[in-house]
Regions:
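Extended, low-complexity cationic-aromatic segments
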Residues: 1-77
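Acidic/histidine-rich, metal-coordinating catalytic segments
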Residues: 12, 87-101, 124, 129
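C-terminal anion-handling pockets and recognition modules
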Residues: 5-8, 131-179
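Short, basic/hydrophobic alpha-helical segments
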Residues: 71-91
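Mobile genetic element proteins and their domesticated derivatives, centered on retroelements
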Residues: 12, 49, 76, 95, ...
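Short, well-ordered coil/turn elements that cap or connect secondary structure elements
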Residues: 3, 87, 111-115
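RNase H-like polynucleotidyl transferase catalytic core
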Residues: 33-41, 110-130, 147
Length: 179
């Protein structure tokens, strides 16, 4: 049974690397061995992402430097602003990254405990977080078997996919379905 007074969000962080990934694919038999270009770099771009499990709405934030307590705090506040307009309580499912427990936002969470809560997954269990499926789908649609000459091309490809998901989205709702 669904609780209509709660917005349940699954959230996580991810890095998409410029070098992409190669996977098996079909090619016509008359084509000689194809050459897939591959950027010899480890440059990457990081994102916070969250899926509202009720309707598949996706929210993301690109991080320029690194993930830490301050950047996670800003993302939590944006999730709360999104859901508080509907009058629902926000419950965020997240992993046990150290900065998710930061003292920086502990007081804020206590002040807003009536309408905001973090719910932690068991340690070392990413398979329980529904948003991991979104990261896998994003990699498959945007990064597999593609060459990116620079990081800006990676950002453009990933954010074009993300922009399709910012409103209610049946694809993500089904992908992340708990009920």
């Amino acid at each position: 049974m669904q609780d209509e007074t709660v917005d349940l969000w699954a959230t996580d962080e991810v890095h998409f690397q410029q070098h992409g990934s190669r996977c098996q694919m079909w090619i016509p038999p008359e084509t000689k061995d194809p050459v897939l270009r591959h950027a010899p770099t480890r440059r990457s771009v990081g994102y916070f992402g969250a899926v509202r499990l009720r309707d598949g709405r996706f929210q993301f934030c690109r991080e320029a430097d690194k993930f830490n307590g301050a950047t996670f705090f800003a993302f939590m506040k944006s999730l709360r602003r999104t859901s508080i307009r509907t009058g629902r309580r926000v419950v965020v499912i997240t992993d046990n990254a150290r900065y998710h427990h930061a003292r920086l936002h502990k007081e804020w969470r206590e002040v807003h405990a009536e309408d905001f809560a973090l719910d932690y997954l068991p340690p070392y269990s990413p398979e329980l977080n529904p948003i991991e499926r979104v990261w896998k789908l994003t990699r498959r649609r945007c990064l597999h078997n593609r060459y990116f000459p620079d990081l800006d091309n990676v950002i453009a490809a990933v954010e074009a996919e993300f922009d399709q998901w910012t409103n209610r989205n049946e694809t993500l709702r089904r992908l992340c379905a708990i009920t």
